[in-house]
């Protein structure tokens, strides 16, 4: 009697996403070899597809059917198994919203608000994700007014490979300076000193200034 056919089929296997493709390929190649067949007469073990390919490292599956043929019964023995790579985590991208701060705060306060605002853009998921900004080192606007637009880019080795967004941080313009200067004034002599003093005091107050930030009028 011909040797009995001994057919050992691979079992379904699952690998995690975000490994290198080389690691997935190596695991898949080793998995293929776990299907073995011996016995019968002139036995031949083939696969369908003829040249099985590993799934993508970002997720997918490959089902392989092995067929062992023998010129002695059983003439054909088959089995199938599936090698799966789990799907990569979905990219979750939360972008900062435009923000406006009032002028005339301290620069330290503006810088702190800007730094906190930068952190409101977050990204996770995909594979080997990296979040970068343009400009590389964003700087807060001047406390007296201005704006900074930042573009964030999240890259992943699995789709979506690039996700971007932009937002603007603005400091309102400081109020315009309005400066009204006293005009030359002449008083007649021979008034009382009290009258001159009163007129002088009134004249001093005709110079006024408003606007800017933390303005101070001195003489």
Q: Over which residues does each language-model region extend?
A:
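Proline-threonine-serine-rich low-complexity tracts
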Residues: 1-219
């Amino acid at each position: 009697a011909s040797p009995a056919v001994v057919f050992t089929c691979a079992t379904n296997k699952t690998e995690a996403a975000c490994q290198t493709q080389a690691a997935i390929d190596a695991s898949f190649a080793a998995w293929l070899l776990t299907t073995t067949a011996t016995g019968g007469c002139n036995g031949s073990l083939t696969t369908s597809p003829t040249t099985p390919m590993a799934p993508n490292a970002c997720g997918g599956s490959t089902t392989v059917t092995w067929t062992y043929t023998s010129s002695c019964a059983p003439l054909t023995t088959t089995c199938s198994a599936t090698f799966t790579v789990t799907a990569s985590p979905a990219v979750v991208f939360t972008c900062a919203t435009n923000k406006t701060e009032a002028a005339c705060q301290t620069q330290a306060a503006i810088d702190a608000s800007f730094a906190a605002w930068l952190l409101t853009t977050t990204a996770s998921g995909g594979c080997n994700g990296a979040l970068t900004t343009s400009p590389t080192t964003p700087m807060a606007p001047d406390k007296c007014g201005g704006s900074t637009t930042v573009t964030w880019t999240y890259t992943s080795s699995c789709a979506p490979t690039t996700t971007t967004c932009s937002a603007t941080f603005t400091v309102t313009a400081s109020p315009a300076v309005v400066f009204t200067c006293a005009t030359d004034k002449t008083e007649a002599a021979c008034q009382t000193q009290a009258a001159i003093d009163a007129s002088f005091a009134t004249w001093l107050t005709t110079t006024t200034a408003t606007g800017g930030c933390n303005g101070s009028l001195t003489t």
